[in-house]
Amino acid sequence: MDAHQKQSLPAVTLAAIGVVYGDIGTSPLYTFKECFSPHIGLPPTQQVVYGFLSLIFWALILVVSVKYLAFVLRADNRGEGGILTLMSLAGRNTYAGTTTVLLVLGLIGGGFFYGEVVITPAMSVLSALEGLSVATPALTPYILPVAIAVLTALFVIQKHGTGSVGKLFGPVMLLWFFSLGTLGAISIFKNPQVLAALNPHWAIQFFLTYKTVAFFSLGSVVLAITGVEALYADMGHFGKFPIQLAWFTVALPALLLNYFGQGALILSNPEAIANPFFMLAPEWLVFPMVILSTMATVIASQAVISGVFSLTRQAVRLGYLPGMNILHTSEVEAGQIYIPFVNWMLYIAVLIVVVTFRESTNLAAAYGIAVTGTMVITTILACTVAHYNWDWPRRVVKIILISLLLIDVPLFLANVVKFFAGGWLPVMLGAIMFMVMATWKWERFLLLRQLSRMSMPLESFVAMVEKETPQKVPGTAIYLSRTQQGIPHALLHNLNHNHVLHERIVLMTFRTQDVPYVDPDQHIEIKSLSPNVWRISATYGFHETPDVYEVFRRCAMKGMAFNLNTTSFFLSRETLLPSHRSILARLRAALFIWLSKNSLRTNDFIHVPADRVVEMGVQVEV
């Protein structure tokens, strides 16, 4: 039983409010303000205000409530979600060519997520602290340094984990949503006719009147649904129903009340377009709202940082990224991890973004492309799963696909036009991450194929050992092997150069399945190949961390004990050399070689004692 099933529904729902809805829950800070930004240039008339409110309302209903909560959340891999999970599910029952296309789409979506993660903390924290200028313009020069200080503190505390303060996320975000709803409801009460914007007629009329400008304004409307991917990505932590319950009972009502409250305020006071969120609050409440909004944006930023840690671990375990040092920050929650390299690279990127863009308005143009690009990819992958995995009729899937793309594609295109205004940032970051993941996966495949060609078939080795009976030395030799085909090169080198073998030889392979967790009883498989040669296959899910001590413990339970003092681990250490291929292939090989040199060594990844490791070198052209 999962952790979220063991806890009470109210507790899990409260936790989901604190993590899942942090990003989308802080969107009212900047969304409506950006709808009236100078580059759009629309006046705050009744038709325009109603048009924007209607678009925001139907975006929250159709994209979040219908597409994600009713459709996409059905596509779980044993309870887990996320873009890479969706990619794995979509590729299970399709043809080889289709699988390749889906793989590329999934990696592009993963790259977009990394791009979005860089922007979210910067955008959120800046927009919260900009409330200081509403309280008093004299504090405006301090917004940027305070934002840098807040973000620095956020990334510094990552190594300590969020176990203790994480318990406050839910209550703080609940207070945040209560404040959103209350301020919005008070404003609506003063101008209740604003509720007429619930009618989609106003959205349609908005497009008929303003045409091209209305289309471009979708780039601001989409800010209302940024963070929607978290609903799917965090499904494994909280479960489907608590996420749905938190949305329909807390997040959605509060967001709608606040957006419509901002609209009512602008209709009665057009000057409020400068910062309608903070101007909703009475003057005495502005400072407390700045503090609360800063706390909410820090929580939202923490959620996406934790999300990128989780995605990175999943990508490493599935073979899309090189090995990294992954630290567990909680003895209770396996999902609470810290990846130092990712944390500090992300911090540097966020800092550069904050210093470069300086204001949330400047960042708004950069925000939408990654979000809407991921939305389009999610629609395609989810519909593929619906047809091939769930056996939904092709006609039904086509109707769903076309209907969802009619929403996603216009939102994406409206953001593409903002490419040179800042949209290049997530595209560039996404392209870099896609190139890294695709290169690592492809070049690893080529490397393993090359090593396989250089190896000896398992049957030939066993026959040779039984026939020639080389000299035996006491102890156990464990040879770590990447595949179950052929003999590890370290074993061949040891035999050819030292002409000896250990009394007991174990070929050990660690495999990762595209499921989050593997049944503990299925972790270890032991097979005898000859009287003194054994093969051990250790299988894990992509959310599990392999550990050689656990392998030993499970082997002992199956009757095969190991004495660490008399056991040596032999590893192949490849020296990679670029081959004479095309220029593009050589560039990929150079990137792969650099990634390999900086990746975590296998013995460190599976926690092999350093004093029991023997490395055997081999040169391979890639």
UniProtKB/Swiss-Prot annotation:
UniProt keyword annotation of Membrane present: yes
Ranges annotated as spanning the membrane: 9-29, 52-72, 101-121, 137-157, 169-189, 213-233, 247-267, 287-309, 337-357, 363-383, 396-416, 419-439
Domain of life: Bacteria
GO terms assigned for molecular function: potassium ion transmembrane transporter activity; symporter activity
InterPro entries named among the record's database cross-references: K+_transporter, K_trans_C, K_trans_N, Kup
Catalysed conversion reaction: K(+)(in) + H(+)(in) = K(+)(out) + H(+)(out)
Keywords assigned: Cell inner membrane, Cell membrane, Ion transport, Membrane, Potassium, Potassium transport, Symport, Transmembrane, Transmembrane helix, Transport
Main location: membrane
Cellular location(s): Cell inner membrane
Gene Ontology cellular-component terms listed: plasma membrane
Bilayer topology term: Multi-pass membrane protein
Entry-linked PANTHER family: LOW AFFINITY POTASSIUM TRANSPORT SYSTEM PROTEIN KUP, OSMOTIC STRESS POTASSIUM TRANSPORTER
Assigned protein family: Belongs to the HAK/KUP transporter (TC 2.A.72) family.
Functional summary from the UniProt entry: Transport of potassium into the cell. Likely operates as a K(+):H(+) symporter.
Protein name: Probable potassium transport system protein Kup
High-level lineage: Bacteria, Pseudomonadati, Pseudomonadota, Gammaproteobacteria, Aeromonadales
